[in-house]
From Swiss-Prot:
Pfam family, one: Ribosomal_S5
Name recorded for this polypeptide: Small ribosomal subunit protein uS5
Source organism: Bacillus anthracis
Keywords in alphabetical order: Ribonucleoprotein, Ribosomal protein, RNA-binding, rRNA-binding
Gene Ontology CC terms: small ribosomal subunit
Keyword Electron transport attributed: no
Underlying gene: rpsE
Subunit note: Part of the 30S ribosomal subunit. Contacts proteins S4 and S8.
Length: 166
């Protein structure tokens, strides 16, 4: 799969979580901050990244850089996704279902951030299994990356869309 050039896109960032993590050493605890960020152009491109640093702004900056390296293209049909899909990652599972125009983004927390920045405006989703933000985001991105348009599937099979849909 080809890499998407982030410099050609107008990306928007959204910080999902900031977590203070500790390393216990002989003299006490050493604190660092872990940031989880989602970036997207609201037009079919989205990515997520993590960063860790001594200070919060540095962790966010690192997470944004990481997210720009992990962009994926999301096939959209109007304001929604082409078909129902389940995204999996670890114990996290996210169910994504296309919705009629005007429904809005029905999703919780981290999943909502990914879907909104991907440019999906109408969708139904349900988080199943793990509700850890990183697992939910990875499961959502996994599901979105496996989406295919009817035209693409028809082309792969050498058929017309009408033949495919019956």
């Amino acid at each position: 799969m080809h890499r998407i050039d982030p410099s050609k896109l107008e990306l928007e960032e959204r910080v999902v979580t900031i977590n203070r993590v500790a390393k216990v050493v002989k003299g006490g605890r050493r604190f660092r901050f872990a940031a989880l960020v989602v970036v997207g152009d609201k037009n079919g491109h989205v990515g997520f990244g993590t960063g860790k640093a001594q200070e919060v702004p540095d962790a966010i900056r690192k997470a944004i850089e990481d997210a720009k390296k992990n962009l994926i293209a999301v096939p959209l049909v109007g304001t929604t996704i082409p078909h129902t899909i389940n995204g999996h990652f670890g114990a996290g599972e996210v169910f994504l279902k296309p919705a009629a125009e005007g429904t809005g983004v029905i999703a919780g927390g981290p999943v909502r951030a990914v879907l909104e920045l991907a440019g999906v405006q109408d969708i139904l989703s349900k988080s199943l299994g793990s509700n850890t933000p990183i697992n939910m985001i990875r499961a959502t991105v996994n599901g979105l990356s496996e989406l295919k348009r009817a035209e693409d599937v028809a082309k792969l099979r050498g058929k017309s869309v009408e033949e495919l849909l019956g």
